[in-house]
Amino acid sequence: MQTTIIYITGVYDTLDLFTQELKNAFESMGYASFTYDARLGEVSKQALIECIEDGTKRGQRFFCVTFNNLGYNLSLPAGMTGTGMLLRQDIFQGIGESKGANSVKKEINLWETYEIPYINILMDHPFHYEKPLQNAPATSVVLCTDRNHVRYIRRYFKNIRYTD
């Protein structure tokens, strides 16, 4: 069974350099790679979804390895399930819900939908990432460069099940 590691680039040059080195190392160990380029927005997102959909049909496994929460909030397009199927919009609207302009629908997180482990390497203190860590995918694994950062996450972010 082939394993593909998904990388996220296009936000910070320094992190892109780290990512490229990780990619080179993992490819030398036989892992396949997919790079999501944030500069390409929806084009890159669609290519990622197609890669996951096609790979899943062949029994392929996926992991995302990224830095500083990049891509934690990637979501599926409105009305799309994790099987490539589009749902009718009214399925998302329950009886009695407002359908007005202020109505907010929860976006469907890509990592959770496809059950892809989201390995997040924090280069900075977690204090700087309160919102992303509070809203981290359920599949998150947070790796820290400092043991004090690990203790901080374990104390303040109970939603993150795995950190080291």
Task: List PLM regions with ranges.
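Catalytic core of nucleotide-activated saccharide and alditol-phosphate transferases
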Residues: 115-164
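N-terminal pre-catalytic "stem/leader" segment of glycosyltransferase-like enzymes
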Residues: 1-113, 117
